Amino acid sequence: MSRVAQLDSIALDKELYGQFWSEFNAAFNTSEHKEEWELALNTVVFMCATRFLPHYGSSCTYGSALSGVVFQCRKRTLYVVTVLAGYVWKKITHIIFNGPHCGNQMMWLKLYKWVNLLYHGCDVTNFLRFLAAEGPNARAFLSPLYRAFNVHSTRLIRDGSAIASEFYSNSVFAGLEYQNRQLLWNALLELFSNTLLTKRGLLTFVKKPPRSRSTTTYKTVCPRCGGFPTNPYQIACCRANYCYVCVVKALEWSMCDACGSSGRLTASPVY
């Protein structure tokens, strides 16, 4: 079965729990006994999902039902690995890091770090085995905790045949369609930026109105930067003096800042 669907089921559950918790936390003061409040809320969400969703002989969460994935285990086992285990780990972490830093506490802290490192190593190994699992009889475990409790995920079966969640399929196709539109839009923007929106292509259609300064002013003031012309060049259309850098820009854009002329401009050094 699709490995992406199994991973998406976990991501959907985390997003659901996080959304409910953020709304609950904004409405009520949960500064005291925060972990217990979160456990109670996640338990209610889990019970509602497992009670009212169709199971077809298996256990499933809200996210797994949307992605067409079920778990071959009992509901209480699925509750332990999806909800209760996270609460227990948070409480252990809270006790170890917030306890008094005595001799026993430092020993527990070292043990915690070693257990955490060992779990992450097992998690990497389990993920590689999860990706390599093939065949209809292969068991896929989403984490070492799932493997320890023998909670493996399979495809949702109805009437003897595997079915795909319509919501999940539509979500995947909608995501692909959105990415295709983004690629097309980026290609159009790149086309415009390389053709119509270039300085030469755009400024040929835009003519600046003539400046009100007199010709004598442009002999001592660069019409582009407003400073004294450094290494001056005189443009042929109105004989205004430009700085060298400014006249290069004016010739590149084919637009005179002094008189608004456009087209094939030329300039020559004053001295």
From Swiss-Prot:
Q: Which InterPro entries match?
A: PEX2/10, Pex_N
What is known to happen upon mutating D257A? Does not affect assembly of the PEX2-PEX10-PEX12 complex
**BP term (GO), one:** protein import into peroxisome matrix, receptor recycling
From the UniProt record, give the pathway where this protein acts: Protein modification; protein ubiquitination
Show the stretches that span the lipid bilayer.
Answer: 3-29, 34-60, 78-97, 102-133, 176-197
On the Peroxisomal matrix side, which residues?
A: 1-2, 61-77, 134-175
Q: What is its EC number?
A: 2.3.2.36
> Which GO terms fall under molecular function for this chain's record?
protein transmembrane transporter activity; ubiquitin protein ligase activity; zinc ion binding
User: What are the binding positions for Zn(2+) 2 in this chain?
Assistant: C237, C238, C256, C259
Question: What UniProt keywords apply to this chain's record, in alphabetical order?
Answer: Membrane, Metal-binding, Peroxisome, Protein transport, Transferase, Transmembrane, Transmembrane helix, Transport, Ubl conjugation pathway, Zinc, Zinc-finger
- For the ligand (Zn(2+) 1), the binding residues are C222, C225, C243, C246
Cytoplasmic compartment ranges equal 30-33, 98-101, 198-271
Question: What's its membrane topology?
Answer: Multi-pass membrane protein
Q: What else is known?
A: Present with 339 molecules/cell in log phase SD medium.
Function recorded in the entry: E3 ubiquitin-protein ligase component of a retrotranslocation channel required for peroxisome organization by mediating export of the PEX5 receptor from peroxisomes to the cytosol, thereby promoting PEX5 recycling. The retrotranslocation channel is composed of PEX2, PEX10 and PEX12; each subunit contributing transmembrane segments that coassemble into an open channel that specifically allows the passage of PEX5 through the peroxisomal membrane. PEX2 also regulates peroxisome organization by acting as a E3 ubiquitin-protein ligase.
Oligomeric state and interaction partners are given as: Component of the PEX2-PEX10-PEX12 retrotranslocation channel, composed of PEX2, PEX10 and PEX12.
Concerning its family, UniProt says: Belongs to the pex2/pex10/pex12 family.
Q: What is this protein called?
A: Peroxisomal biogenesis factor 2
User: Which classification does the entry list for the species?
Assistant: Eukaryota, Fungi, Dikarya, Ascomycota, Saccharomycotina
